[in-house]
Amino acid sequence: MAEEKKLKLSNTVLPSESMKVVAESMGIAQIQEETCQLLTDEVSYRIKEIAQDALKFMHMGKRQKLTTSDIDYALKLKNVEPLYGFHAQEFIPFRFASGGGRELYFYEEKEVDLSDIINTPLPRVPLDVCLKAHWLSIEGCQPAIPENPPPAPKEQQKAEATEPLKSAKPGQEEDGPLKGKGQGAAAADGKGKEKKAPPLLEGAPFRLKPRSIHELSVEQQLYYKEITEACVGSCEAKRAEALQSIATDPGLYQMLPRFSTFISEGVRVNVVQNNLALLIYLMRMVKALMDNPTLYLEKYVHELIPAVMTCIVSRQLCLRPDVDNHWALRDFAARLVAQICKHFSTTTNNIQSRITKTFTKSWVDEKTPWTTRYGSIAGLAELGHDVIKTLILPRLQQEGERIRSVLDGPVLSNIDRIGADHVQSLLLKHCAPVLAKLRPPPDNQDAYRGEFGSLGPLLCSHVVKARAQAALQAQQVNRTTLTITQPRPTLTLSQAPQPGPRTPGLLKVPGSIALPVQTLVSARAAAPPQPSPPPTKFIVMSSSSSASSTQQVLSLSTSAPGSGSTTTSPVTTTVPSVQPIVKLVSTATTAPPSTAPAGSGSVQKYIVVSLPPTGEGKGGPPSHPSPVPPSSSSPSPLGGSTLCGGKQEAGDSPPPAPGTPKANGSQPTGPGSPQPAL
């Protein structure tokens, strides 16, 4: 084997006769032998070099077979024009034949039988061309039908943008990974038979990112034209509709490259022309694109960030900087940059750190104009309290001296004075809330002046305002409102039947005091029926001027004239501290003759109306009940109780039978009965 290898290595040099043949074909005769030998050595070396480079390309492609494209790449590497026309989609299987002392490699072509071609049946006739209509959109929404493409979800957009090798087209999931060039030939030769080639011959599968061509349909082109014209046009109503469409439409994924290019080019042109209105419109387009939850903008941030940063730190954005409000555009663009950093900044791209360095560099420079200085401070302040604490607060003293030199010094330029005033207002606006959280109260102007220089007194006053505003907001958050809606409760006191007419005592309590419905029954021993006057009823109420709730005892005392005993039925309830007003209503009613015994009497109703105590408004918060244990040894257990009673008034008719009150707790009142009020 070693001898054969040495023999093959010795035969790799071309014979010198080949050089003579080539020279004769070119019209050069009588070439010397030494010249042919030198040419043979040089050509052999060049061929070996090209072959080695072609093998390198083959190994880099992870293939086991050398192709003509590898030879072409090797020739291009040597600055040699490659050979054209020797390309094939598949590997060409050359066959070897020898005879007559010669060796020949040839490509074996397939023999075709004409009878097979003639007898082959004709293919099916294709279908005729037809037109079919379907809805592109219904009231601005694309219907989910097979003819309409589904909108690409945000996850798929992110995967295509960040991991192109893992993303696949809709028809490639079933086919699996892309195949090498040799796999298709192996499958064709197998004719349906499953052949698994060795991995050394096939190579590892690889996937290339397909070239994405952003081709818009006619409808999308028309939509893009209308949207861009409306966003930068003069009609505010159309502009609002266009921005709303950009912020909510889920089918703008294919038009994102156009929109980002439109915004970046528009900012570049209008900054040179100092067109403030168009710059504002373009920034509103950026805001609408970022508000759309279905769009993934990370692939286009490299175009949007320079456009937004230009509107922040540009030296001049309008024709009249002393009159036009370009400060609002800088503030709006600074908020956009902060939103971009919040959504797209990662540890890989470091968007926020790079933007922070840009703002800091332009702010620290002594030659920076006041407009650029304002934009840099606004951009840093919108990035959060940590950036303010780290980068802005340490430079407040230097910036305050620069502002004071412009405001208090000789008037050099009105634009500089206006810019310094805006920078001072911006610093006070953003630094005061941070200082209110960092520094403990109280706030001393001398301490602020010593730490922050000329801005110290103004900062101190703004910090005091920030503390007061924060306390007011906390008080508003902690304030609670309790609304209780309950039906009006009714307390009915009834007694068992006794000799003589008896009437139940009815106590009405307002709906603001939640009293449970309770029924008290006082049983007495039976006595011979005899006419007797109506009993006297007393309601003992306790009132207190304090704000706390108390426990009140309602006692019903009934005394009969013919007996020496008194029955007391206490009812304990917890109500808020109120000052009651007792109203005595005397009512004369007529009962059916079959149920009422002979005799005359009157009904006395005590209506208790609770009012707030003296010094308490109507809108005060309700008091929480704090029950106090009552004493059962006295009808009036609480100090300061008021005994409310009334004189008996004779009625025109006997009272109704006991135990038959109205359903709503009221008794029928005659038209002629007096109603005195206490």
Swiss-Prot record:
Modified residues (Phosphotyrosine): 253
Protein name: Transcription initiation factor TFIID subunit 6
Biased amino acid composition, Pro residues: 622-632
Annotated GO CC locations: cytosol; MLL1 complex; nucleus; SAGA complex; SLIK (SAGA-like) complex; transcription factor TFIID complex; transcription factor TFTC complex
Compositional bias of kind Low complexity: 542-574, 633-646
Modified residues (Phosphothreonine): 120, 248, 660
Region of interest (Disordered), ranges: 142-201, 524-574, 611-678
GO terms for biological process, alphabetical: mRNA transcription by RNA polymerase II; negative regulation of cell cycle; positive regulation of DNA-templated transcription; positive regulation of transcription initiation by RNA polymerase II; regulation of DNA repair; regulation of transcription by RNA polymerase II; RNA polymerase II preinitiation complex assembly
Record's subunit section: Component of the TFIID basal transcription factor complex, composed of TATA-box-binding protein TBP, and a number of TBP-associated factors (TAFs), including TAF1, TAF2, TAF3, TAF4, TAF5, TAF6, TAF7, TAF8, TAF9, TAF10, TAF11, TAF12 and TAF13. Interacts directly with TBP, TAF1/TAFII250, TAF9/TAFII31 and TAF12/TAFII20. The TAF6/TAFII70-TAF9/TAFII31 heterodimer forms an octamer complex with the TAF4B/TFII105-TAF12/TFIID20 heterodimer.
Single annotated GO MF: RNA polymerase II general transcription initiation factor activity
Organism annotation: Mus musculus
Location(s) in or outside the cell: Nucleus
Cross-link Glycyl lysine isopeptide (Lys-Gly) (interchain with G-Cter in SUMO2), where in sequence: 196
Membership in a protein family: Belongs to the TAF6 family.
Modified residue annotations for Omega-N-methylarginine: 524
Function: The TFIID basal transcription factor complex plays a major role in the initiation of RNA polymerase II (Pol II)-dependent transcription. TFIID recognizes and binds promoters with or without a TATA box via its subunit TBP, a TATA-box-binding protein, and promotes assembly of the pre-initiation complex (PIC). The TFIID complex consists of TBP and TBP-associated factors (TAFs), including TAF1, TAF2, TAF3, TAF4, TAF5, TAF6, TAF7, TAF8, TAF9, TAF10, TAF11, TAF12 and TAF13. The TFIID complex structure can be divided into 3 modules TFIID-A, TFIID-B, and TFIID-C.
Modified residues (Phosphoserine): 264, 626, 634, 636, 653
Entry-linked Pfam families: TAF, TAF6_C
PANTHER family hit by this protein: TRANSCRIPTION INITIATION FACTOR TFIID SUBUNIT 6
Keywords: Isopeptide bond, Methylation, Nucleus, Phosphoprotein, Transcription, Transcription regulation, Ubl conjugation
InterPro entries xrefs: ARM-type_fold, Histone-fold, TAF6, TAF6_C, TAF6_C_sf, TAF_TATA-bd_Histone-like_dom
